[in-house]
A protein has these predicted regions:
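A broad structural signal for alpha-helix termini and local helix breaks/kinks
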Residues: 31-32, 193
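A short linear hydrophobic-aromatic micro-motif
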Residues: 32-36, 285-286
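Hydrophobic side chains in well-ordered alpha-helices
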Residues: 23, 55-58, 238
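Interdomain "pre-motor" coupling segment immediately N-terminal to P-loop NTPase/helicase cores
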Residues: 29, 36-91
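Short amphipathic alpha-helix segments
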Residues: 11-31
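Conserved helicase motor core of SF1/SF2 NTP-dependent helicases
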Residues: 97-109, 113-227, 231-312
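N-terminal presequence-like segments and adjacent domain-start helices
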Residues: 1-14
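Short, surface-exposed acidic/glycine-rich loop or hinge patches that mediate macromolecular interfaces
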Residues: 11, 21, 49-50, 232, ...
Length: 312
């Protein structure tokens, strides 16, 4: 008789076991030659060695499903243990799944171009108005890379000075000062990763969120690096950021040319970079438009109204 301990890593074991160990009971019923007990993140298995190997493969398939989709239904569980394709796997074009199980994927032609550009290039510029999903989709691509282990970390950054505000004149310590600028990045991550796992990854610096000034002097390797609100960088700041790129790293730079908050809009680093880097191999540029807006339908009308007013 063989005994083995299977350690459940990278996911909350409760998601695998099910409420009241309901999922585990279904799995155990299919392996009558085994005695299975679970405690914490360890499953203790005792019994026939061949059946144990099949059981271990089944547990790994379920773990991979939970890791990918952040959830597993009883129907999915039964499909997996019976060797069938799950409904979730049948959905095409999904980047990752939210913590509620909602598929995050392209919702417009230009969003799909962003995904394609990311897969084909090491550096991508995604430019478009608010609400086009450029930041959210970029973070989803980064989370996917982390889950698939094609990247070891995610680094997210924004310029910390916008709308004429300067950090030195804001109240509180440094974290209090920069967090409001970085909140949109936290919001996207919280939609895609369970809170406990996200907190653990941030404490281990697997996920790093920092203002642009903190990038100086670093070489960013084995990572997906995203710079948001790049239209509010100076040419010197953006050049500094772009040259941080290390081995096995992908960069996504997002920005909205209609929301430049610099004192001199002509001095936007994003405007200059798009001009200077045009046509360089390995750099993709994707332009999103108001047709790609995926927020409330009023957002599209608001953007159109402001554009019409600016033309008068």
């Amino acid at each position: 008789m063989t005994e083995k301990h299977i350690v459940i890593e990278d996911i909350d074991p409760v998601m695998l076991y099910g409420v009241g160990n309901g999922h585990l009971q279904i799995i155990k019923s299919l392996y009558p030659k085994l005695r299975v007990t679970a405690r914490g993140n360890v499953i203790r298995v005792l019994g026939d060695s061949e059946e144990m190997q099949r059981f271990e493969r089944c547990i790994e398939q379920i773990r991979q499903h939970v890791l990918k989709y952040n959830a597993i239904t009883e129907e999915d569980l039964i499909d997996i243990v019976n060797g069938r394709q799950t409904k979730a796997d049948a959905v095409k074009g999904v980047v990752v799944y939210s913590i509620s199980g909602r598929p995050i994927k392209s919702r417009s032609e230009n969003q799909q171009r962003l995904i394609d550009a990311y897969e084909q290039n090491d550096m991508v510029f995604a430019v478009g108005p608010a609400g086009t999903g450029k930041t959210y989709l970029s973070i989803a691509l980064a989370v996917k890379a982390l889950k698939e282990k094609t990247a070891k970390k995610i680094i997210l950054s924004r310029p910390a000075v916008e709308a004429g505000e300067k950090l030195g004149f804001l109240p509180g310590d440094m974290k209090d000062k920069i967090d409001p600028y970085l909140q949109p990045l936290y919001d996207a991550l919280e939609d895609m990763l369970p809170q406990v796992k996200l907190q653990d990854m941030m404490e281990k610096h697997i996920i790093q969120i920092a203002p642009l000034a903190f990038m100086r002097g670093r070489t960013l390797s084995d990572a997906v690096v995203i710079l948001d609100e790049a239209q509010n960088t100076t040419p010197q700041q953006l050049r500094m950021f772009l040259t941080r790129m290390g081995w096995n790293t992908k960069m996504i730079i997002t920005g909205d040319m209609t929301q430049i908050d610099l004192p001199n809009p002509q001095k936007s680093g994003l405007v200059e970079a798009l001009r200077i880097l045009d046509g360089i191999e390995g750099i993709g540029v994707v332009e999103l438009t108001k047709k790609d807006i995926v927020r409330h339908k009023l957002v599209t009308r608001i953007v159109q109204a402001y554009e019409a007013d600016e033309k008068q």
